[in-house]
Amino acid sequence: MSKAKCIMVQGTMSGAGKSLLCAALCRIFAQDGYRVVPFKSQNMALNSFVTRDGAEMGRAQVVQAQAAGVEPDVRMNPILLKPSSDVGSQVIVNGKARGQMSAADYFRMKRSLIPDILEAYNSLAEENDIIVIEGAGSPAEINLKADDIVNMGLAKLVDAPVLLAGDIDRGGVFAQLYGTVELLEPQERARIKGLIINKFRGDVEILRPGLAMLEEKTHLPVLGVVPYLRVEIEDEDSLSDRLDAKAAVKPLDIAILRLPHVSNFTDFIPLEQHPLLGVRYVQNTRQLGAPDLVILPGTKNTMDDLRWLRESGLEAAVLRLSAAGTPVLGVCGGYQMLGEQLCDPAGEESGTPCTLRGLGLLPTTTVFGTEKHLTQTAARAAAPFAGAALTGYEIHAGSTEVRGSAFCTLADGTPEGCVQGNVFGTYLHGLFDTGELTEKLTAFLCRQKGIDPAGAELIPMEQYRQQQFDLLADGVRAALDLPAIYAAMGMQKGDNT
């Protein structure tokens, strides 16, 4: 079996649209009949996923795998950094946590991870036709280039041709692309096979003179101008846009607390797509108002975010709303906060040993430890969502003692989470993806508010996701010079037949 061909997408900066371009290429190559997988050697993100075999990986490569029509595999993202503070992260290698590291300590040791990166990449290359590689940030961060393992450093290791993308929506795209190319070493510059203008709004003809000058100055072809595509696909780069977005006015108002270390906010994307549910993210009591449901999401630092909740006045506001009958849902770290007590005897979560009082809305006690619980599971929800089937995954380091009713029952019969009155808590991420729990929750909130939910039909999440991947692929396929991209990989479209 011949080894896979590859193409790498690098960007002029974070947020240039690399993740979605890679997802689009994965979909396009899959549509063209190739076995394709994504790859990113090192990802820094708070949003993560647990694979079927219990390994943790970044969600960007999960989305790209879904676009390619393959099951997420930790080899697609061998190194994941989950920031726990401004200067440190939890380092996850091959799906398992290696511990907390400062940025300085990680930079000193990261080249020792090259064998892990190459083992993951080479094993994928033996099983597939094409690997779509995503870079990180910019390849022209000259202070980081010496020990680079994710941009040109990786391209050299796997001999990858590179496409360089710039975001025109932010302005200055010609300077971005030209400056990036000029800051590269000659051998790095030689790897770039073409430039991509991303997120363009307007008439492409207006760009023609600029494109011609850019090609003349860089001696590189512009392989496409990709329009600003309005597709509903979760995107690591869209985090701030999504959290800042103004919620559409809909009959039911859901307020999600925007915790400082919020993680896996992607849990709630299915709620945003429901015709009756308006979802907004709030940071203070003024924004909170009087919603129909309050959600405490997951967090990478439960203890610090609980302190913030208390100091910001949001804890008191949530307690008042709950006392007045407003439903409250906590997921993972948010679930832990809703309990009576959180204990960190070894300082695993907060840096120093401590015990904090929770919100006291659920009869639970959480104790943090060193071992992280990673698993995929299926479950059936209990009242008031009785019968709803859900699938999800757990990523948490604490164990929680529950002195009350369960939120759901796992496939093996184990009770999970907690319910007390109108307060619900669960460790399950991805709980709304199947749609059944979303419908049960919507019906429950409608009853609470006296609204008739009739006529509000929800497209199944998986069907909707596939539609969006096809829309993305259609838009990018129409914009890019695909024959040139195939040629850059040493291929021709159709040579797999």
Specify the residue positions occupied by each region the protein language model found.
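Flexible phosphate-sensing "switch/lid" loops adjacent to ATP/NTP-binding sites
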Residues: 1-322, 327, 347, 370, ...
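Short, Gly/Pro- and small/polar-rich lid/capping loops
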Residues: 4-9, 343, 356, 361
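Catalytic nucleophile serine of serine hydrolases
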Residues: 332
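Extracellular/periplasmic helix-exit of transmembrane alpha-helices
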Residues: 339-347, 351
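Conserved P-loop NTPase catalytic core
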Residues: 348-375
